Amino acid sequence: MKEYYTISEKKLPIIALRGLWLFPNNIQHFEVGREVSLNALNASLLRNSEIFICTQKDPMLENITKEDFYHTGVLASIKQTIKMPNGNIRVLVEAYDRAKIVDFVENDSFLEANVEVMEYDKTKYHPTDKSLTMIRMIISSFESLAEIIKKPLPQDLLGGLLNEEDPSSLIDTIAMLISLNDKDSILLLETLDMDERIELVYKFVIKEIEFLKIKEDIEERTNKEISDTQKEYFLQEQLRQIKMELGEEYDIEDTDDYANRVKKLKLKKDSEEHVLKEINRLSSMNPNNPESTVIRNYIDQVLDIPWNKKSKSSIDLKVAEKVLNDGHFGLEDVKKRILEYLAVKKMTGSLKGPILCLVGPPGVGKTSIARSIADATNRKFVSMRLGGVRDEAEIRGHRKTYIGAMPGRIITQLQKAKKLNPVFLLDEIDKLASDFRGDPASALLEVLDPEQNSEFTDNYIEIPVDLSDVLFITTANSQEQIPDALLDRMEVIRVTSYTDSEKFEIANRYLLPRQLKENGMDKSQFHITRDAIYTIINNYTRESGVRELERNIGKVIRKAVVKIVKDDVKKVVVNNKNLEKFLGSKLVLDDEIPREDTVGVVNGLAWTQVGGVILTIEANVMDGSGKTQLTGKLGDVMKESAMAAISYIRSNQEALGIKGEFYKEKDIHIHVPEGAVPKDGPSAGVTMVTALVSALTGRKVKHDFAMTGEITLTGRVLAIGGVKEKVLAAHRYGINKVFLPKENKRDIQDIDPKIRQKIKFYFTSNVKEILDEVLI
């Protein structure tokens, strides 16, 4: 202990101040309101008015223990007490010496302790030259401090400080006048060496001057920037300027968290800098500014992208084969091609290569095949419907400058998957459209091109997203409607129509059990016969897929449920005899096509987006002036086929046995029934020639034939598409003789062998061969 201190010990009541520090040689006012403090105050007044005053560590604590305040404080004397209207006592105290608690005294009413008092004797302290110099610097700096705050200290106080002969009193008084935090205050109280204490106060004064200069500069800049409408945000703006001056970020709720989360994503340098720049903009922006909401939404969207999150994808061909077989009946060629595709992916370890495009009519299982691929490769599955999409922004997103802007659906689906390598189904890619808002097909080019999609940039996100690990699969009903540039990037796998036997197996294995489960039934309560299922297939649906078939099975089961619940029936059996009670009258009758030989009526074969159909073409010839009329809502290509057919007949009139100048003396009317349904395509050419020649010659056409093929002016028959669907349509209607172009002979290998055996195929390269066979 220094020679200028005299140590004594006293038993004193304790008052702990909240947010206030008291130093020796100073007078201070404060209010006392807590019961423990009031009791300590009264005990002091009853003794000699001496009290130990210290500071509470946490000013928010109401009930304190001996561990909740600093044990170093001051010995003070109570000079005055005034009772306040709110019940508190206002106290005036004078602090004398530093003191610290030695041990506590048990007391239930107030805090009390044995305190070691360090009484200072100014006559025994002899400052060093360094300390004297520093004291002068403190006084000079304190005068500068008064000028900076532009609130001059009272002359009596300033004069008292300048004339102060006691260094201890001087520096303790100055410590009371400057802003010190708890750490600095307790350090100053605990420092007993006068030379060290002088040096500490000098540092504190210099620090206070620097702080006030910065504050003054900040206030000046802030006042210039704040307009009349921004005055209410004055405090937030000040805080922003303070943080900017310190080189720190302004923490608007969670900008620090944003920055940390972005850094953890390990983005490319340019991408990370771009997002951090937006976070910095947010940190320096008033939270009430509408643009801060836009930036916050943008950052949230970026963070929602699964940048480095990928499923642990594995390709096990045995598992893949089992998944495909369990989920799909038939479609053997499709399954084989998908297994080949997956095998190549596993061998190369790369997803670069053609994108699979599953083309086929609705309801044949294209979407479920894509789901099975996801299951087989242990990936998440997401899908995006492209039907009717006209706006490029649906793919690429809107720029965030627009109100309500959001990322495109590619990004949102990745966010939904929470993985960066899902199986991504682009459904109905042939239904894309375009208008003044852009061409979404062009936007998809970048998505589907393996050489480009590693740098896919959404207009909203603005930084590249790597799509190279995404397994894209597309579906379409018609290959012809897919834009050429997109088609060039895809490998087409045709998912053809189901045969009746395949539909039966699908219904029996999958649809029936699923509908029973959904309606709370089991096999012990419901049975439908084989013949009844075939009747539903042939007389209530007539579709390429099985969606309508499942709906009808569900309808039958629901009515069976009503019967069981209402009539207390234990089991319902559905057969051909009672099927109409469940489904009503047959929707597709067996006599839709000619069942006898007729003049001018021919069974054509057509392919639609719902599969193959019989397209009956009728031709009639009557006296007239050579007019030609086409009805049945025919498209331009089909009309041109009719014109080509007439030209062929005119040029071969004599060989065909047609007399007279029919093109001058007769009017020709070609009609295709179901006039409300649009029809188009070149494959009805041979059918029109046959119907016209029959009508012009009066020769009947054999009703058990069906035909398809494009006609040329010379009578050549050209190849067409959709052979499998067309042949299945003929089989459904009971037609077992089919004319096909010779070039399509290879296509019948795709047809079920059981059906091939039931149909006699005629392959022709010239329409004359058809006429010779079918005209009677």
Swiss-Prot record:
The EC code for this enzyme is 3.4.21.53
- Would you identify the family this protein belongs to, as annotated? Belongs to the peptidase S16 family.
Extract the GO molecular function terms from the UniProt entry: ATP binding; ATP hydrolysis activity; ATP-dependent peptidase activity; sequence-specific DNA binding; serine-type endopeptidase activity
**Family matches, as Pfam families:** AAA (PF00004), Lon_C (PF05362), Lon_lid (PF22667), LON_substr_bdg (PF02190)
Q: What HAMAP family does UniProt report for this protein, alphabetically?
A: lon_bact (MF_01973)
Q: What does this protein do?
A: ATP-dependent serine protease that mediates the selective degradation of mutant and abnormal proteins as well as certain short-lived regulatory proteins. Required for cellular homeostasis and for survival from DNA damage and developmental changes induced by stress. Degrades polypeptides processively to yield small peptide fragments that are 5 to 10 amino acids long. Binds to DNA in a double-stranded, site-specific manner.
SMART domains associated with the record: AAA, LON
Keywords noted in UniProt: ATP-binding, Cytoplasm, Hydrolase, Nucleotide-binding, Protease, Serine protease, Stress response
Which sites bind ATP? Answer: 360-367
**Name of the featured protein:** Lon protease
Domain named Lon proteolytic: which ranges?
596-776
This protein's assembly is summarised as: Homohexamer. Organized in a ring with a central cavity.
Location of the Lon N-terminal domain: 12-209
Q: Where does this polypeptide localize?
A: Cytoplasm
Does the entry feature the keyword Protease, yes or no?
yes
Which Cys pairs are S-S linked? Answer: none
Do you know which InterPro entries this protein is assigned to?
AAA+_ATPase, ATPase_AAA_core, Lon_bac, Lon_bac/euk-typ, Lon_lid, Lon_proteolytic, Lon_Prtase, Lon_prtase_N
| GO CC list | cytoplasm
Specify whether Lipoprotein is a keyword of the entry.
Answer: no
Q: Which Gene3D superfamilies match?
A: 1.10.8.60, 1.20.5.5270, 1.20.58.1480, 3.30.230.10, LON domain-like (2.30.130.40), P-loop containing nucleotide triphosphate hydrolases (3.40.50.300)
Q: Which domain of life is it from?
A: Bacteria
Q: What is an annotated GO biological process for this record, any one?
A: protein quality control for misfolded or incompletely synthesized proteins
The UniProt induction remark is:
By heat shock.
The annotated active site, in chain numbering, is 683, 726
UniProt catalytic activity: Hydrolysis of proteins in presence of ATP
